[in-house]
């Protein structure tokens, strides 16, 4: 109902007629509502001063837009530090980039919601990105899907997931008989995928603490985003081989 407020509609009409920049002065509490209204007619990139402000604004916008808004986090580390960014951060960044692609190129076969609004702190936007990351897609599994069970560990390893005996953190996966436990990079809980031969019969979430499935938390599909922004793709292997060959020709 708030989005149909006459005063808000007047602001939105002015915004739609603006040819260049438009400055809107409002109280802080009204900003999420105004942004949600603007998002009904055009995709938005909302820039905040800090990550904390960005996370808070994303939560407020979600009350109006649901899954149509996401926060684009920045790395917790500098590009040349030995420390790697957390798997959660990497997964969320790749998820946002993928969902932006879905907004431009809808895919009826993809169950993931496209984005209307991306919220990002200024720091997130000044960190350089590989151009190929915009085309990174998740590995999606769904109930009744048939997939070569023997190839699944290889696929997950290629997405920088680590095979372990017991899943405990994001990026882990374990194989026991016809069951595969995976902790997706962007998920709150890990998932347990049961196979009947090469067919997926069940997908359930489970708790890390006791490894038991969570009641009434069955899923019809699950998406695994990569755990690293640097993946050994075929193109990357060719470039590495070419670089190695070039370096072998250099004599010091």
Question: Across the structure, where does each feature detected by a protein language model lie?
Answer:
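ASCE RecA-like P-loop NTPase motor cores
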Residues: 1-250
